[in-house]
Each structure stands twice: as C-alpha cells, then as structure tokens.
Amino acid sequence: MKYHSETQTWEYLHGDKRVTWNSSFPKNDFYLSDYGLAFFYSPYYTAEDDNLEVCVNGEHSIGWLVTLSYLQEKDEELISQHPEWLNKFASIGTPLLVSHIVQNEPEFLIFQGNECCLSDVDLPSCHVLVYRLSKAKKDDIVSFLPQLYDKGFYYINKLSDVVNESLFYKSSYADNLIKEEKKRRINLKKNVYSEELVKLIKNLYEKWLPYSYINAFSRYIYLYQVVEYFMEIAFEESLFANIKKYNNKNISKNDLRKHIQDDSEEKAKIEMVFNGVSSNDSVVIDFKQNVKRFLGIIGSDFNGTTIGEHVYKIRNILVHNMRLAIDYETELNDIVECLEKLIVLKLKNSISENFNKHIVICDISEKYRTNRKRMRKTYVQFKYDNG
C-alpha cells in the first residue's frame, strides 16, 4: 500500500492493476502491520454515526467498530467533528479495507483498463472492527464474539455476507460458543460529544433561547436544531432499551424490528422528546392552536394531532415552502414563542431526579454539577419560569 498525500489517495498494486481509493481521513503515523480487521453486521446500528469504541472489562480499548459508511465519508469538515481516536482508527481501517477487498472480494472493484477503484459499498448495517494487535489477536476476537453477539453485532467472514438475509440473526460460529460462560466483558462506548455538539449546546445556552433578536423564520429553524439534538438522544435511549428487552427475551425479533422502524421516523423522535410534557399543558394547547391557525392562513392542509406532527409540519413548510409563509412572520412568531416554552419545559423535566446528563452539558471541561447550576441560572429561570 502506498499513500499519496497530495491527492489523499491510497494506491494498491495488484498484478498489472492499480487500485486507488480516495480517503479524507488524515493519515497518521500508525503502522498498518500493527492493526487487524474483523467484520460484523448489526441490523440495529445502521446510521453512519453508529461508531463504537470496544473496551474489555471496562478498562483498555482494543479498537473501534466503525461503520462502513463512515469509512467512505468524504466531507472533511464532518470528519473533523468526530473524536480524534475514532478518526485515527478509521484512517488505519481504510487501507486495510482496500487490501481486504482487492485480495478477497474483487467484486467490489470497478475496472477501467489497467486502472480500477473501489465502488461505493452500500452496506449500512456493516461495521468494521479495527483493532490493535498488541491488545487483541485474531483468536481473541473469537472469544469476544459471545459478548458482541449479545449486544447485537454478528460476526461475518466478508462484507458480501451482509447481503445474505439467511445469515441474519445467526452466528458464524456454533450456538454452543454463544452459550458458553463469558470470560471477558465487552463494553461498547459511544463518544457522545463532538465539537459540533458542544457548539450546539453552547449556542443553546448563550444565544438561541435567551434572545429573540433574529427573525421568526430563522429562529424556528435554530430551535428545531435544538430539538434535533434531543431527538438523537431520545432515539438512542429507545434503541438501547428495546435491544435490552430483546436480549432478555421480553420481545420477539419482529417486535424489535417494528419498534426500531417506528421510532426512527422523525415525527416519532420528536414525540419522544416531548413525551414528558402533558398534552393538557397550556403551552402544548397554545402551540397546537397557533400552528393550526397559521396553517389555515397560508392554506396548507393538516390533520395531525401529536406535538411531533405539529413541530415537523412547520419545519417542512419553512424548509420546502417558505414562499407560503414569508408574509406571515407575526403569526409564525406566536408559534416560535410556544416552541421556546416547550423546550424550556423539556429542560425543566430533564433536571428532575430522572435527569439526562447529555442535555445539560454546556462545558465538558467542568463538573456536571457546575453545568447543572449554570443551566438553572441561564434559562430555567430566565423568562418562562413563572408560566
């Protein structure tokens, strides 16, 4: 393998063929020979950002489960927003993956004379485990399989196995291995905080909620971004809860699939964000009434009943049909103020005894209690504290 820094391209000479793959991950000083690859699929983790650090016994990290989608990411700005160590392992995983495909799965190559490149490998449920050989050998990976199996990751010998539906929910190893006593506990850690998320929460504290100096159209979109951040937290919590139920045999595979499919809908995610807010709350009632009045004025049909449907409908109008709303900023402002109040209600609920720490982090360099006090001071008391 040879790396061309000027074009950010990996080159692999295979006989008289030259295989290239452009990579946007910054090259590091790691040696390829110090790392190994193993392939897994998971029908539960299919988003590009479902990258998980693999730790043994809660201590040392052996590597990362990196989605195949993320390994093919070309947006350097997006990559820079992810954890440094994830990107280092992805940088190593890219040339190792190229070598594997050239040697073992050439059907993923596109040939043009003596040149060939990798095709876009569209396997969203596939993960590549990039691991340190100093921390785990190939035989060790076999001993980790039962724990990874329990967490919803199924070992496969090659990428193309993912498209074989008959392999789903089966292990490549005998069932008795899966049922053996587990000697090593595997922990999967998802790095929650990227620079972009920290920036988002900082803006949430310092600009979007406390001030209303921007126009209603932009303000609604800003606030919707806040809701989107909460949506990912809510979906992740729901996903882990359902996987736990499945692993404990409390629900069937079909039920699990249905839960994941239903919860992944954007309107359903919004509903999960606000499920702690009573539908009889005056803020909810005002929000729904203002939305319906606004949609009636601009002539847009709507028969939704849930908070999620109302929030999502206005978002779609502003993103896809702004021309319908452009003359009605005053009416939209009533909706924006209600959405602010809904977010504050969400935040109030989140610092109860059943708080979610993800929501109240403003500065990850400070202690959680410091952040919590700052949140209380910043906007739980700033203008909607008394109704």
Predicted feature locations:
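Charge-enriched, short contiguous segments at helix-coil
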Residues: 1, 8, 288-360
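Flexible secondary-structure boundary motifs
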Residues: 246-305
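Alpha-helix capping/termination and helix-coil
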Residues: 230, 234, 264, 278-281, ...
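The feature marks a conserved, polyanion-engaging helical scaffold used by nucleic-acid processing enzymes
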Residues: 197-204, 208-272
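Charged, low-complexity surface segments at secondary-structure and domain boundaries
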Residues: 130-135, 186-191, 242, 254-259, ...
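Charged, non-catalytic interaction/linker regions at domain boundaries
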Residues: 2-214, 229, 333-386
